[in-house]
Every structure is written in C-alpha cells, then in structure tokens.
Amino acid sequence: MVSINSGPISSFVSRYSMIDSDTLLHLSSFGSTFNPNYKAKACIRFARKVCGSTVLGFLEVKPRKKSCCSRCNGVSRMCNKRNLGWDSEGSKDLETEILEFMKNSEKPGMFPSKKDLIRSGRFDLVERIVNQGGWLSMGWDLDEQEEKVRVNENVTPQDLHIEKQLPNCNSPEMDKTLNHGDLDLSSNLSSSTEQVESRNDSGIEGILTRLEKERNLSLGISVRENGKSNGAMHDISPNGSVPWSSRIVTASEIQEVDGSRGSGEYAQSRYQGAKSVSGKPGLSDSPTSETWRTWSMRRAGFTDEDFEAAEISSSGLTGVKKDDTKKDSGDSMNGKDRIASSSEDVNKTHIKHRLQQLQSELSSVLHSLRSPPDKVVTSKDSETTAGNLENLSDDWEYKENEIIHAQNKLRSTRAKLAVLEGKMAMAIIDAQRIVREKQRRIDHASRALRLLRTASIVWPNSASEVLLTGSFDGWSTQRKMKKAENGVFSLSLKLYPGKYEIKFIVDGQWKVDPLRPIVTSGGYENNLLIIS
C-alpha cells in the first residue's frame, strides 16, 4: 500500500505513509536533487535490513541529514527542518507541563506513556510531544504502528487535512525536484519486488516476514499472495490522487469518524472490508493470528473495544480471483457475531468520552458559581461586539445629559423654593405683628368691657313719647325710651363709671326730671347721672 497526496502522478510519497516491498519507488527518478547512487540506495538497504518483512517502513523523499534521522523497530522517520534543541523555550515549557502532569497522576515517579496521556484527556500534550520528538516520544513508534488503521472509503479525503502530514513540502527546491519527469511506477515496483523477495524467504528474516504478515492480516492490513501489495499502486486514480481506502490515520481520527456516523454500521463495514480483501482467509481465523493480535493490542495499551480491524476498500484492488472472493464472503459470515459486540464497544467508548466532557463542563459551572460575583464574567458580556459597545456609549451619554438637565431643574426648583420660603417667613412675621396688635386691642376692649356698668333711666310722668340725650355720647344722639304697661318710660345704658349730664325730650319739649339731681351748665339745666 502507498499513500500519495492528491495531485499528478509524479507526486512524492508522504513521509508518514507505509510502503510495501513491491511498491518501493526508485528514487533515481526524482531528479538531480538526490544522488541515486548513494542516498536513494542507502534508504532502500536500511529499510530492508531493519524490517525484514514486506513492510519497509515510513519513507520521506527528502535530503537526509545526519542529525535528523532516527531508527526504531523497522521505522525510519525524517525530522522536520525546524530546530528542536533542548534549550528552546518550547521544550522547557513542555517538560514543565509533563512534570505537572506526573505530580497529579497516579504514578508520580514514572514518565507518562501515550496511553496514560490519552486516558487523562491530555491530547494537547500528546500532539506536542510527537511534534517535539527526541527522548520524550521514545518508544511511541511501537504504539503508533499498532494504532494505525484504515478508514472507510465512503469518507472523503478532504475531511482530514493531508497538508498536516507534509509540513515542509512546499519549498521551491522540493517542487522543482518533484516536477522533474514522470515516474515509471510499474517498472519500479517490479524491480524492487524481486530484490526484496529474494531475501525474505529463508532464515530469521523469513520467520519475521511471516509473523509480520500474520500481524498485518489480524490488524486488517492484509498482503496478497507472492508478497504483492493489496492494490497499493492500483489504488492510484487516473488523475494521480489516492483513494480514501489507502489512507492511514490514527486511532483518534477513527474515533472522531465513529462519533459522527453510526457505530454499528461503520464497524460492520470496516470488518467486512478487512475480511473481503484478505487473500488468505484461513490466517485471520487461526489461533496464531489471534494470539499475535491480542499480544500486539495489549502491548500498545488497547483493549478489544478500543482497537478494531482497519478498513480497506475493495474498489481499488485489481487481479482478485473470483474463487478468493467466495472464500472471503464465507469468512465475512463467520465474523457477524463480533460485529454486534464491536458496535456496542464503540458506543460505550463514545458514551465514556461524552460523560467526560459533561463532567468537565459541570466542574467549570460549579467553579463559576462558587467564585465571587465580581469575578464571574457572563457569556453575554464576553460576546458584546463593538457595535453594542457604541450603542451603550450613546445610551450612556444620553442618560448623562438627562441627569444634567434634571440637576439643573432641581437647582432652579430649590432656588424658587428658597425665595418662597423667604416670602413665607416675611408674611408670617407680618401676620404675627398684626395678630399681636389685634390681641392688644382685644385685651384693651375686654378690659373696657369689664369696666362697663348697666344704668337704668326712668321717666315716671305721663307722656306719649320720651327721648333721652346726654353727655355720655356727646349729645349726639337721641335715644327713644320704651313705654311699659303701667305707662312708665325706661331705658338701659352701659356706661363707664363717672358723672354724666342727661335731659329728656317729652313730646318735643326739653325737660328735666325733678326727682334727679339738677345741674346748670352754660345757662341750661340738666339732670346729673352718677355711675359708681
């Protein structure tokens, strides 16, 4: 199998792609950038000697550097061009975070493995350690080989970015090298296949080759008879792109695809795809294959519910005989019992992941509820846009103007109130003065009323009409006296104590009463009235 990025057929192999022995490219066709007599052959010999099987490893078509090439369990990786020195700031930060994780883990004295980080949900640390490389990720390549599975061809390749696997392939030198000539893939495949087959038939390398084949069959990476790839180069479409069946992704990407699709249907399609492509149906069901598969998964830290057979598309395979297809269909019927359990295991994994997310959300909500109100920032405040801020600023300015106008009105009202209070005070003072004057008069009048005496004046003689006048009112009025039943005329007056002169007018004539004292004043005789 081979994975080539989308583009013309002259495109190069991804550095994370797995290349079978019969699909190893002849590097001399890549142009003058690489030395075909030294570097290309060195890469091929290195892969053969280490692997000793049909899988030669991971190959990157780039100039090799002395400080940037590492070997681990038959896998050759090419490091990126960026500097990964121990004194870099990112390395120190990464080591600090790993140390904090070890302190909070169940085994503080043991360096965490990839399985421990994934179980704790620290996918960010896994990604950073893989990018950093070096001793931090030492031994992880063993787990990655067992975790790599194949995805259903119904999923489009655009869902997973191919550019992530080729970070440094956009340089002008690489583009110039890759555009040089057309690759004769069929001739290179045949020549490389014959060279590898001659060394994989006997000795320890032959035993390792057979064990590797059985492991690949148990993991869904099946190899056809005579060491040929399962449509590795036949999977290349006419336009140069690689079908989705030849893509290799990690277990975490498979989990994301399983979350968006039906777990039961997806597990069934993957299982049937793996069984239908196998050229040797008996190997996948043999006890040796199951034992090797169980040992590999336990060594990588996966259980049966976390690791399933890879999915291989049968649409890109050519040259498969009809009798092999019939045998594969029989093997597919034997695996129906495991399909149901696999779908249930996928559902359990998805439910566990969902429960962990809900638990983290619940803990964040509880933390926000327990924190002081002034430190809690609501989502509404965080989502306030610049337009809303401008509107709030305008509203604030409008409210400030209203407050200023209200304050001015309040000040004017207070001034008017002060003037009114002054007027009221003046009016109160005047009223109090008038009241005091009136009270003084009332007191004087009351005292005068207390001094008044009632005086009764009588005219005993007969007459028809009798009037009374005197000095008690300055001789200004003539008061008519009342006639009683017995013919006596009388009149009551209230006078202050003293002496008064009075005189009667009887039927129009001025007369004095001979029974009262008589005084002469100015030649006139008047009666004297004394009030004691």
From Swiss-Prot:
Membrane topology term: Peripheral membrane protein
GO cellular component, one term: chloroplast
Keywords of this entry: Chloroplast, Coiled coil, Membrane, Plastid, Starch biosynthesis, Thylakoid, Transit peptide
Region (Disordered): 165-201, 256-292, 314-347, 367-388
Compositionally biased tracts (Basic and acidic residues): 173-183, 320-339
Annotated localization: Plastid, Chloroplast; Plastid, Chloroplast thylakoid membrane
Coiled coil regions, renumbered to chain: 389-454
Annotated transit peptide: 1-71
GO BP: regulation of starch biosynthetic process; starch biosynthetic process
Recorded phenotype for the gene knockout or disruption: No visible phenotype under normal growth conditions. Leaf chloroplasts exhibit reduced number of starch granules. Larger chloroplast starch granules than wild-type.
Pfam family, one: AMPK1_CBM
GO molecular function: maltoheptaose binding; polysaccharide binding
Function: Involved in starch granule initiation in leaf chloroplasts. Binds and delivers suitable maltooligosaccharide substrates to starch synthase 4 (SS4).
Swiss-Prot/TrEMBL domain comment: Contains a C-terminal (456-532) carbohydrate-binding domain (CBM).
Subunit structure and binding partners: Interacts with PTST3 and SS4. Interacts with MFP1; the interaction is essential for the initiation of starch granules biosynthesis in leaf chloroplasts, for the correct location of the process in the stromal spaces between the thylakoid membranes, and for the association of this protein with the thylakoid membranes. Interacts with PII1/MRC; the interaction is essential for the initiation of starch granules biosynthesis in leaf chloroplasts.
Protein name: Protein PTST homolog 2, chloroplastic
Species assigned in the record: Arabidopsis thaliana
Gene expressing this chain: PTST2
